[in-house]
Structures are given as structure tokens and as C-alpha cells.
Design a protein with these regions (language model features):
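Alpha-helical transmembrane-bundle signature of multi-pass membrane transport and export proteins
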Residues: 1-407
Length: 407
């Protein structure tokens, strides 16, 4: 599963490079380029809670097979249209959005499956290991995507991404989900069950102050930090390497930094609190954003992206551990869905806003304001400390859960 997932993520990152770079060649302003990130992230915001409720109610294996098949089909259509030369900005955004829909349904089920495979003591290591494969793919995929696109075309990259989903589908076909001993059976999926499950998830989130801290601080970081991800292809095209290979290398440096961040996260968590790790990560990511705005030397920017990858990984993994540890098992997918909604929604909205600012005032100003916002957002830590321990569900929800209506 780990290797199949990594191969699929390599394909996804290859697609990210190809889609963003293709948009720089067919669009006339920074906004459509930034909207590629919005089209990728917005589906998670729109589908996150229903997807989490469904993931708590149905066989996750079948759900994951469906979502992987959906993404395979969307990537294949995108590849065929690109090879035929009939793809425009809105078609590219629409099919990227379709891929995001599959990812939005896939995310909560995948995240909720991780804690079922390991003990609570091993959860942080498992989250980091899952992030390692994702970020190894992030390090390899962009550079590989840039090279393949330079040697052939975006359409070939999109088709390779479609093929990458096959491995996960084959592995999922052999996987059988194991329910923890003593847990209730899932009820048959129906509209009332999904609505009830969604209401329970929202009730848990509203009633748990410790979860508020995770959501608010994740949203602030994701919103402010989205400028770097959205503007990187624009800056690369206009003032740095000017090639898809160069963009792939810079995006790969972010991924390589994330691998380093995953490797050092466990010792950091033994020595420092969650809040201190997040503060350091946010500050370093602000420095990386500032470097992208002001530095015009490719090697220096590559080093800054490496540091930015370390920063993004340590901060986001810390948020993720807190989000996965807090909810009880029977509510976990729904609570994680809200967390992923906040993360992806802030990323989507932020990308659009930073792209609009870049189009009106300039890319450099957009990045500078983003860096300042990252630093200003650290003030939230004084009022919203993070906690990596389980938070009990309200008694009325516990009674409903013991009734077995939602597994």
C-alpha cells in the first residue's frame, strides 16, 4: 500500500507541474495560474464533511477504489484533450476540479484509515511515515514531471498520472478493512444517515474547544502560506529559470525539504511542545516566501524552497497529529473531514486572493503581504494553544454513538 500510494502521488505531483506550467503558457495573467491551486483544493472544502460522514458509514475499501477510479478517468480525459490540442484555461480548470472532487472524497477515508492500522502510541510515527511517502513523491514527482513535459508534452504527463492510480486500485482490491474490537457495525448508507452523521461531526467540532485551536491555526497558516504555492510557477516563468524543468526542480526542493521535516519531526516532538514546533515552522515558511519575492538567483531560491519544505512539513504534520489524536474513533473521519475542509478551503480561497492581488498590484507585493500575514498569524498561538491528546465527545453524542447508528 505504501509503495503504491507513493507511485500514485508521484503521478499527482507530475500532474501538478504540468497543469500549472501549461496554464502559464495559455493564460494571460497570474490569476488563472493561481486558480489551478484553487481548483485543486476547493473540492475538499465543498465535499469534506459529506465525505467524512460517508467514510464513517461505508466500506472504506470500496469508497477508496471508487475515488481512485474517478481520478484515473479524469486524468485520462485531460491527457487526451491536451494531446489533441483542444484544451483551454477553463477546460484545464474544470478537469483539475474534477480530479479534486476525487481527492476530496478520498482524503477523509484515507486519513481515518491510518489510526486503525497502528496503536495510539505509534500514531505520530505512522502519520509521519505516511507523510514521508507523500513527500518523497513530492520531491521526485515535480522534477520528473518537469523533465517529461520538457521532453514530450503536458498530455503525456497527464496520461502517466492516470496510469499511476492503477497500482493503488489493485492494492485496495486485496485489502480488507479490520474494524476495532467492540466497535459498532456501520449502518446502511442512506440520506438520513449521512445527514445525521454530518450533524454529529459538526456538533463534536463545535463542542470541543481544543479542536477549535487546530482548525483556526491550520486555516490561518494555509491561507497565508498558499501564496508561495500559487505564485511559484508565475515567478519561475517570469524571472527565474523560465522552463518547466526549473519549476519542477523548485517544487521538488519543497518536497525534499518536506522529507527532511518528516525525518526530524519525531525528535522535535520529544523535545519541544506542539506550539513551539509550529511557531518555528511558520517563521521559516515566511522567510521562504520572502525569498521568493525578493531573490532572483535560482540556486538561492532553490535553497529557500528546501527550507520552506521543512517548515511546511513540520507545521502541517503537527496540526495533523493534533487533529487525528483528538476525536474518538467512531467520530474520527468526520472530525478529520472538517479539519481537511478548513485546510483545503483556506488554501483554495487564499490562492485565488493572492492571485488577484498579484494581477492588480504585482506578484512581489502579493508574496510580501503573504509573508507578513504568516508572521502576524502567530499571535493566535497565545489564545489558542495546541493539544495532542484525545478530547472526549459530548455526552449526548456518546449516547448516539453507543446506539450504533454511525459505527
Amino acid at each position: 500500500m505504501w509503495f503504491a500510494s507513493m507511485a500514485s502521488n508521484v503521478g499527482t505531483w507530475m500532474h501538478t507541474v504540468a497543469a500549472s506550467w501549461l496554464m502559464t503558457t495559455i493564460a494571460t495573467s497570474p490569476l488563472p495560474v493561481a486558480l489551478v491551486q484553487t481548483a485543486t483544493s476547493m473540492p475538499m472544502f465543498l465535499l469534506g464533511l459529506p465525505a467524512g460522514a460517508i467514510a464513517d458509514l461505508v466500506d472504506r475499501r470500496r469508497l477508496l477504489i471508487f475515488t481512485q477510479s474517478w481520478m484515473l478517468a479524469a486524468a485520462a480525459v485531460l491527457g487526451v484533450l491536451a494531446l489533441a490540442g483542444v484544451i483551454g484555461p477553463w477546460t484545464l480548470l474544470a478537469l483539475t476540479f474534477a480530479l479534486g472532487l476525487g481527492s476530496g472524497m478520498n482524503g477523509p477515508a484515507w486519513a481515518a484509515a491510518i489510526p486503525e492500522l497502528v496503536s495510539r502510541e505509534e500514531l505520530a510515527a505512522a502519520v509521519a511515515l505516511n507523510s514521508v511517502q507523500f513527500n518523497i513523491a513530492r520531491a521526485i514527482g515535480p522534477a520528473l514531471g518537469g523533465f517529461v513535459m520538457a521532453a514530450s508534452s503536458a498530455g503525456i504527463v497527464f496520461l502517466l498520472n492516470a496510469v499511476s492510480f492503477l497500482g493503488v486500485i489493485l492494492v485496495l482490491g486485496r485489502w480488507r478493512e479490520v474494524r476495532p474490537a467492540g466497535s459498532a457495525e456501520r449502518a446502511p448508507l442512506d440520506q438520513s444517515g449521512v445527514h445525521r452523521a454530518m450533524r454529529q461531526g459538526l456538533h463534536y467540532v463545535r463542542s470541543t474547544p481544543a479542536y477549535h485551536a487546530v482548525l483556526i491555526r491550520t486555516g490561518l497558516f494555509s491561507f497565508a502560506g498558499s501564496a508561495l504555492w500559487a505564485m511559484l510557477p508565475v515567478v519561475t516563468s517570469a524571472t527565474l529559470a523560465g522552463t518547466s524543468t526549473g519549476y519542477g526542480i523548485l517544487l521538488g526542493c519543497l518536497g525534499a525539504g518536506a522529507v527532511v521535516g518528516a525525518a526530524i519531526l519525531a525528535p522535535l516532538r520529544r523535545r519541544f511542545s506542539e506550539d513551539r514546533i509550529v511557531v518555528a515552522g511558520v517563521m521559516l515558511f515566511a522567510v521562504a516566501t520572502l525569498a521568493l519575492a525578493t531573490v532572483r538567483n535560482f540556486s538561492v531560491v532553490a535553497l529557500a524552497m528546501l527550507v520552506g519544505g521543512v517548515a511546511w512539513m513540520t507545521a502541517m504534520s503537527t496540526f495533523s497529529v493534533c487533529a487525528q489524536t483528538a476525536p474518538p474513533l467512531w467520530l474520527r473521519a468526520r472530525a478529520l473531514a472538517v479539519y481537511l475542509m478548513v485546510f483545503q478551503g483556506a488554501l483554495a480561497v487564499g490562492s485565488g486572493i493572492w492571485g488577484e492581488i498579484a494581477g492588480r498590484i504585482g506578484v512581489r507585493v502579493s508574496l510580501l503581504v503573504s509573508a507578513a500575514t504568516l508572521v502576524a498569524g502567530l499571535a493566535a498561538g497565545f489564545w489558542l494553544p495546541l493539544s495532542a491528546r484525545e478530547e472526549e465527545a459530548p455526552l449526548d453524542l456518546v449516547a448516539q454513538g453507543e446506539g450504533g447508528s454511525d459505527g
